[in-house]
Amino acid sequence: MQTTLEFIPVQEQHVEQIVDIYNYYVLHTTVSFHTEPLTLEEMRAQLFDLPAHYCSYAIIERMDELDTDEQLAVASDAAYESSLLGYILLTRHKAKQAYDTTAEITIYLKPDQAGKGIGSRALVFIEQAAQQHGFHVLVATVCADNTSSIRLFERYGYEKCAHFREVGRKFDQWLDIVSYQKMIGRREGVDG
């Protein structure tokens, strides 16, 4: 049996699992600067209340090439229904119109899915989606302690463009954030 990774627009049935993933990072890490868990309603707003060219995707694992007995076993296995591995967002970088060709990237995975290459595949996918939506620049802002995300963005050509010192406080410690950016679109009038 093989599995494939799919990126599909987030749907209502994904929201509960997505809020669980996000709230793990809220409660146990400095990856998120929220200090209180989000409610389902708050997460729905983040996922669905987006201007048209911003979007959210669920990262889904699907099983392939099953024989009939395996298909029956999978269909009755409640664990299979939980095939959502994480989610990706393209959101507004800033709320002013001149920023409309720039998007901020967010990638969250279930904690047990880190280090498996899923984040890399998600980043490649979201860059392609961003190009199709006409974005020129992608920005990723992460806690400076989040070295795995920093390595991911650097590996894919993102350049550090900002470092803000001690702008957050969580778990009784001051936290820095760093921003990375990547030009993905053509510059009208410059690139032809």
Regions found by a protein language model. Name each.
Residues 20-37, 49-50:
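Helix-loop element at the rim of GNAT/NAT acetyltransferase active sites that forms part
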Residues 35-112, 123, 183-185:
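Acetyl-CoA-dependent GNAT
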Residues 89-92, 97, 139-142, 154, ...:
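Conserved catalytic-core motifs of GNAT/GCN5-like acyltransferases
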Residues 108-109, 115-132, 150-155:
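Conserved acetyl-CoA-binding loop-helix of GNAT-fold acetyltransferases
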Residues 114, 140-150:
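Conserved beta-strand-loop-alpha-helix junction that forms the acyl-donor binding cleft
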Residues 130-142:
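Conserved GNAT acetyl-CoA-binding A-motif
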